[in-house]
A protein has these predicted regions:
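C-terminal lobe and adjacent flexible extensions of AdoMet/dcAdoMet transferase-like proteins
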Residues: 195-204
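Class I SAM-dependent methyltransferase SAM/SAH-binding core
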Residues: 33-88
Length: 204
């Protein structure tokens, strides 16, 4: 999957996904944890206000693709790469100012448990930045197709779930949802097109 990841997203990035990443990450700063950075498509969008960036990528093939991008940007701010996953996140409580997740929570074993871990490692007032594809509940026909295809899709696409309601799970994990935009991710199959993106805060 790592070998074809960037090629798979070329058209999607050009059709607006790259702009979404830039807008989401342009205002983050301080100590940042990104879970599941994959090949590092977010790296170019982190601003100089970041003082420390930890990239938690459990897939060794993704880490191999990530390494040269990290090396190219390491002079901007300290970057650490770890093989950590989210079950649990191996950092102390209240360790980070920001946690970033883009197209990750669809494929973790338990997205609700992952959100609780994200909440735990954020400092009070910290920001959770997210971009995730979700269940197309507003389109019954498409939602039925998601349900039918999901068992095979998970096996083909690295445990990617099509029917998760991550937009509902975020506030359920204790976050204050500040911004959540629901929009179609162009140049993708219809079953993964509906997305939610924005940010939520850990209450002070």
């Amino acid at each position: 999957m790592a070998a074809m990841y960037d090629r798979t997203f070329v058209k999607t990035e050009a059709a607006g996904l790259r702009d979404w990443r830039a807008a989401l990450l342009g205002e983050v700063g301080g100590e940042v944890l990104e879970i599941g950075p994959g090949t590092g498509l977010n790296l170019e969008h982190y601003p100089a206000e970041v003082t420390r960036l930890v990239l938690a990528e459990p897939d060794r093939h993704m880490r191999a693709k990530l390494a040269p991008k990290v090396e190219a940007r390491a002079a901007r701010f300290p970057i650490e790469v770890t093989d950590a996953g989210v079950d649990p996140i191996p950092f102390e409580a209240e360790s980070f100012d920001v946690v970033v997740s883009t197209l990750v929570l669809c494929s973790v074993p338990d997205h609700e448990a992952a959100l609780i871990e994200i909440h735990r490692v954020l400092r009070p007032g910290g920001r959770f930045v997210f971009l995730e594809h979700v269940a197309a509940v507003e389109n019954p026909k498409r939602h039925r197709w998601q349900q039918r295809i999901e068992p095979l899709w998970k096996r083909w696409a690295g445990n990617c779930h099509l029917t998760r309601t991550t937009d509902l799970a975020i506030p359920a994990a204790g976050f204050e949802l500040v911004e959540a935009r629901r929009e179609s991710m162009r140049q993708t199959p219809p079953i993964v097109r509906v997305t939610t993106r924005g940010y939520a805060l850990k209450p002070v």
